[in-house]
Amino acid sequence: VIVMKFGGAAVADAAGIRRVVALVQAERARAPVVVVSALAGATDALLAAADAAAAGAGEQAVAALVARHRAVAGELGLPPAVVDDAFAGLAELARGLRLVGAVAPRLRDEFVAFGERASARLVAAALAIAGTAAAALDAGAAGVVTDDRFGAATPRPDAARMRAAVAAVAGVPVVEGFLGRDARGFVTTLGRNGSDVTAALFAAALGAEELQVWKDVGGVCAADPRVVPQARRLAALPPAVALALAACGSRIVHPDALAHAAAAGVPIVVRGIASPAAAGTRIAADAPPPTGVLAIGHDEPGDPPAPTGGFAALRANAAARGGALVGLIGAPATLGGLVVAAAARALATGGVPVFAADSLPDGGAVAFAVPAASVRRAVTLLHDCFLAA
């Protein structure tokens, strides 16, 4: 068994869903379980539609969402009923929000859940029409039980139920990412990028051979390739190094997903949709440990805070001063005073002031608080200092 997770960018449109179908079919012999996010932009659109509905103006936003999904279904050769069934109840929920005039956290989760619900049904139907039997799975009903902290629920997975739900599917299970249900059966969400967590929970419950996380980048690089195009791809990482990258702002894999997979001994392989034949990056306990500075992570100004407790105090300090973090990740024995001093010199010489610095308790990363407008320059300076060929 393998688990294949596809984010919103991968299922953004009919062409993307066709690529997903081809990738899943290529792995059919390995008994894939698929986890999908909502179509790109659908979650934000649903959140906005919920607020609009509470203000008495949600009908147009809901209609636009349904129309977008219907258009994708049409391009895939699927009947409108696939989308209409997925969105059944959304218009009624919007009318209820209009009457109440506010969006309670529980109702917000119920509203936003329609994104993953529609995506899973579109992908399952696209697989079926391409000749591969598939069925969409309600993650909460399938065993992703959570607490009732709506919007950022903590999973308390029922592994036996998850295995039974997967086994009951005559074909490829397509699981709604990001979603769960609390003990009362109410829909909950796992927080931003929570589909990674869903995928890791299923990989752990199933004892999967590997968890494939399919992205628009072909693996984990030594620095963000949008900032440093020549940054080299990292072939393998220990989970602790991947977690240190996440603490420094990397959004490649959700840190909770890294932790769940590592605890279960399931390797994560980050693969690129645009280059499916490439090896990607393998995150596993048997990966060689770093021997020096390995990578540079950074916060992306304007993004929500990184979903990890690492560097929380430093990040808050930086935010209070209009700043963000850039960090060095590597061997704890390497990231000592000399490296920190060299990094500070490189930043100062390049005109990037440092507000403060801190390191992780295990010494696997050191981060610097710098002005948000200078984050990308800081990444380039540190890459040139430590990682340039």
Positions of PLM-derived features:
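A conserved regulatory-domain signal marking ACT and ACT-like small-molecule sensing domains
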Residues: G280-A389
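A conserved active-site cap/scaffold subdomain adjacent to cofactor or substrate pockets
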Residues: P238-T291, G297-P304
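Short phosphate-binding/catalytic loops that engage adenosine nucleotides
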Residues: T132, V266, V352
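Nucleotide/pyrophosphate-binding catalytic subdomain
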Residues: V1-V253, L258, D362, V366-S374
